[in-house]
């Protein structure tokens, strides 16, 4: 049987849009989690006609989302095999890597042992050491930082260590140097931090403003991803939103920054007017950062409905030689206890122009099936995990 190949693959990761607890959810403290289901309940039904038309309620029934007779997309559900439930783990697995050692998160701040090592390395004291919003923590500790020169260290629900400092108190070059040293320290398996972020700010007397001189010191993926294979074979690999940061630029031919989900979707639509051969890959982070961690189911629901409206433009622009894949990287149920991600299945929707009636792609045993399918499509080396579903399209 002839396999249809596509010139362009558009991959949308709806950050944290899980679709029900994974079989191993109990091990993560996530029994009963269902990001989409619980948001729909709190919203008294989600209004997402475009996702409904693609077949979302064929994966799992979601309140308010009609189960259409003939879905316009193929649909399935994916289970993560890697041992974490964070953004990097989910995305790296999508592109073909199996993460056996999870990145660590620090909901109660960093261990004193690490803080002492940072003090020794830098000769500076430390303020904060807690989970915080970047704008809130400089509001709270900015004055003390300026007085003492101590570093403001904080984290989030993700595997990150962020260091905020006033540009006139800790010059940029010094801050970057500190972050590089901390990056080296935190490669130790007992810390295993995904990203170190320099967060410079300016201002005076409590009126602080973060500058655009932020710098991320990520981990490079420990193996080759499908994006590396595409780039090396001469295909385009366009990263929209925080995709380039997640893979530390590996396998990226063009990086497009975004400031919000709306902005990301607009930039995705614009990228569809470009002539290219390869992958256009976007992460929509607001679902996770603005609503999931903040346990705001109504805000999350409204953001999903807004995404659905913008999705109509994407679907309309899909040409004969294009394929659109929509999925997620983990869950973040905004009615679940705590503020962390949740271990869940993720939805899979695959749309091409020629589908008369979408079929069930079944349970995919790893997120890497997406990467394997993309590799198969462009006939580059397949990842060591994952099964292509290209022939089913």
Curated annotation (Swiss-Prot):
Disulfide bonds: none annotated. Its cofactor is Mn(2+). Its EC number is 5.4.2.7. It is found in: Cytoplasm. Pathway: Carbohydrate degradation; 2-deoxy-D-ribose 1-phosphate degradation; D-glyceraldehyde 3-phosphate and acetaldehyde from 2-deoxy-alpha-D-ribose 1-phosphate: step 1/2. Signal peptide: none annotated. GO terms for biological process: 2-deoxyribose 1-phosphate catabolic process; 5-phosphoribose 1-diphosphate biosynthetic process; metabolic compound salvage; nucleotide metabolic process. It catalyses: 2-deoxy-alpha-D-ribose 1-phosphate = 2-deoxy-D-ribose 5-phosphate; alpha-D-ribose 1-phosphate = D-ribose 5-phosphate. It is an enzyme of class 5 (isomerase). It comes from the Bacteria. InterPro entries: Alkaline_phosphatase_core_sf (IPR017850), DeoB (IPR010045), Metalloenzyme (IPR006124), Phosphopentomutase_DeoB_cap_sf (IPR024052). GO terms for molecular function: magnesium ion binding; manganese ion binding; phosphopentomutase activity. Its main location: cytoplasm. Mn(2+) 1 binds at residues 15, 329-330. The keyword Cell wall biogenesis/degradation does not apply. Pfam families: Metalloenzyme. Keywords: Cytoplasm, Isomerase, Manganese, Metal-binding. Coiled coil: none annotated. One of its GO terms (cellular component) is cytosol. Mn(2+) 2 binds at residues 288, 293, 341. Isomerase that catalyzes the conversion of deoxy-ribose 1-phosphate (dRib-1-P) and ribose 1-phosphate (Rib-1-P) to deoxy-ribose 5-phosphate (dRib-5-P) and ribose 5-phosphate (Rib-5-P), respectively. Belongs to the phosphopentomutase family. HAMAP family: Phosphopentomut. PANTHER family: PHOSPHOPENTOMUTASE. This is Phosphopentomutase. It comes from Halalkalibacterium halodurans (strain ATCC BAA-125 / DSM 18197 / FERM 7344 / JCM 9153 / C-125) (Bacillus halodurans).
